[in-house]
Amino acid sequence: MLELPIISISIFLPLISVLYILLFISQSKKADKPIYVMYVAVLSSVLTFISTIYILIEFDSSNPAYQFVERYAWLDKIGLEFHVGVDGISILFVVLTSFLTLICIIGSLFTVKKYIKEYLVCFLLMESFCIGAFTSVNLLLFYLFFEAILVPMYIIIGVWGGKNRIYAALKFFLYTFFGSVFFLLSLIYIYSKMHSFDLTYIFQLTDNIPLFAQQILWWAIFIAFAVKIPIIPFHTWLPDAHVQAPTSGSVILAGILLKLGGYGFLRVLLPLCPSVSQEFAIYVIYLSVIAIIYASLVALAQKDMKKMIAYSSIAHMGYVTIGIFSFTKAGVSGAIFQMLSHGVISSCLFLIVGTLYERLHTKEIAKYGGVASKMPVLAAFFMIAMLGSVGLPGTSGFIGEFLSLLGIYKVNVVATFIAALGIIFGAVYMLKLYKEVMLGEITNKEIMHFRDLYKYEIISIAPLILLIIYFGLMPSSILNVFSLSVENLLVKF
């Protein structure tokens, strides 16, 4: 195994690129030429993606422990170390982060018209912070990365968003910050008891925390991650954020940021409070079932494409939480697979909506119709992404939902059948969306002048389409990566 600090490279390469853009390009005579900023951003994202692919290739899935571990002293007095590593659960999210960031940066080169330098800087910062969060083995370091993500996403929505972007950005910030306060208080208590933030050390001493304190701790940490997923009733920020965010912002929001909530449950909440997690699991399961049905029904009534996909995300993440809190290998494996699959499918759907918006400058479903006759390639891509979203066998969407339902069936049959109704509702609203946008007669004359996908749009969308199919046909190649890590996680259950 190569002895390079490969995880540090993946984390700091985007940050170094940001510093180069801000300190050198901005101060040079080339500052008025965004092309140089674009070169740096693309090169940085390509190299970061290559570094994460290297980690995946060299990763030993037969070893459930952390690999590529790096540990450096930082602020010992408060227990903060730069302690990073990857296991089977985190490695695929690291790759997903670098992959989606690369796609977003490439797409942004052709669609963002103002403040391109600042826009790309925000995405590079987001990439660095997300990889840092997914690889942190120190709880305080995880918190710092987890919260740092807030700032660039707030700026992306607030500066490059739609008409009501300020409201959406502020709502996003306040909701997430609200959850962060509970998380911070939890960290203070943990350090007062353990005198360490090392996750591997903390999880060995969880029995030393009194039961009542564990219960309070559980709810505090649960709220922090429930806001991020989001679980009802902490969900209302998401539709507004998606509708107002630029296309690439929606891709990162749905593809990566929501996954940090589910990842937080797996990485922090379950190992820290195993007995209390089992005690309160029934409440999470019913909240998840409510989220699946409620979000699906609300999605049916939407007239805005992005808002419909946003509510579908809430429903799909409901399958993630029921899988996690089933405490079964099938359920947890399904939840992880569902997060990865949803990251790909939702990103693809938002990119497709973005291509339509670039042409007609509206996301209102009623303004479309008959688009397939003018954009057959887009129609084919949309069809595959839509079928993946409804969980058709042979697509990635089927595997995650099936395993999550299989896991929860072993512990709660009633919740399983109610959650399964969400699949039916999902098929209804996604087929309805496809029919109204792509099929039928052209009623809007502007659609007559539509041109099919440009090369950069194909480059952005096609890899996601291939992944939807690959994940669906070859799920074992993904499941095997985190199989032993899931077993290791569930030892206390």
From Swiss-Prot:
Transmembrane stretches, start-end: 5-25, 37-57, 89-109, 115-135, 139-159, 172-192, 216-236, 251-271, 280-300, 308-328, 334-354, 375-395, 411-431, 458-478
Keyword terms, alphabetized: Cell membrane, Membrane, NAD, Quinone, Translocase, Transmembrane, Transmembrane helix
Molecular function GO labels: NADH dehydrogenase (ubiquinone) activity; ubiquinone binding
EC number assigned by the record: 7.1.1.-
Topological category with respect to the lipid bilayer: Multi-pass membrane protein
NCBIfam families, alphabetized: NDH_I_M (TIGR01972), PRK05846.1-3 (NF004499), PRK05846.2-6 (NF004506)
Described function: NDH-1 shuttles electrons from NADH, via FMN and iron-sulfur (Fe-S) centers, to quinones in the respiratory chain. Couples the redox reaction to proton translocation (for every two electrons transferred, four hydrogen ions are translocated across the cytoplasmic membrane), and thus conserves the redox energy in a proton gradient.
Protein name in the entry: NADH-quinone oxidoreductase subunit M
Lineage of producing organism: Bacteria, Pseudomonadati, Pseudomonadota, Alphaproteobacteria, Rickettsiales
Gene name of the record: nuoM
